[in-house]
Amino acid sequence: MNLEALPKYYSPKSPKLSDDAPATGSGGLTITDVMAAQGMVQSKAPLGFSLFLAKVGVQDPQFAIEGLLNYAMALDNPTLNKLSEETRLQIIPYLVNFAFADYSRSAASKARCEHCAGTGFHNVLREVVKHSRSGESVIKEEWVKELCQHCHGKGEVSTACRGCKGKGIVLDEKRTRLHGTPVYKICGRCNGNRFSRLPTTQARHHVQKLVPDLTDYQWYKGYADVIDKLVTKCWQEEAYAETQLRRVTR
């Protein structure tokens, strides 16, 4: 059994109305078996298990983020060590949340629209025609709400790759014309991952507000390196939890 099969056990199931006798010799796992296995995995790989459940939306991410925060605080990074304690305590939690958001992304996930800040609308200054009681029309400039064209008023956008639309492969037009039959290749935009990663420029913009004299060297060797280590830690812990679950349920 793998971790991807766990979320369905957290969803309520409708009763099976049938006159068929249930099988008594089935080798399948019951819900009780799965829950017991989860308890054992949680005791052996608490961080990885919490990270996965938080990623799929089953569990609140607070515990997983706290575990990542403890890991980040223990990192011996020269750039972060030079910061004042106040600035360090402001930057590290942000980097942790950014890394968790990057780890949680998939082709099916949604993200807040950055163009409208999740509101679905833009406040724009437009010329509006006003009519007085006497019938005269006057043109005035007013702030009006307009639908965001990027998210179409939803306030969120899909994180799926725009090149392959979450498929991981795209049509190879050159070879298709050559062979006369559809030929596909790995999407060069997402490298087959099916989704786009969070651009680290967002994190850099936030860090630069707290560290105005931030240089490229400090960013890549310090803050960006911490983000990469945190994301790698997430995947390592999830893989360890997966190994423990398979060992328990084999």
Segments and roles (model prediction):
Residues R162-K165, K174-T176:
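Short helix-loop boundary/capping segments
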Residues A117-G120, H152-G155, K165-G168, N191-R194:
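Cys/His-coordinated zinc-binding microdomains
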Residues K130-V138, E142-H150:
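Eukaryote-skewed repeat-based solenoidal scaffolds used as protein-protein interaction platforms
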Residues H122-L125, V157-S158, V170-L171, S196-P199:
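Short, non-ligating residues that shape and space the ligands of small metal-coordination modules
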Residues G135-E141, K174-P182:
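Short linker/helix segments within small regulatory modules
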Residues M1-K130:
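N-terminal alpha-helical interaction blocks
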Residues S109-R112, V144-L147, V157, V183-I186:
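Short metal-coordination and nucleic-acid-contact micro-motifs, chiefly zinc-binding Cys/His arrays
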Residues I186-C187, F195-R250:
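Alpha-helical oligomerization segments
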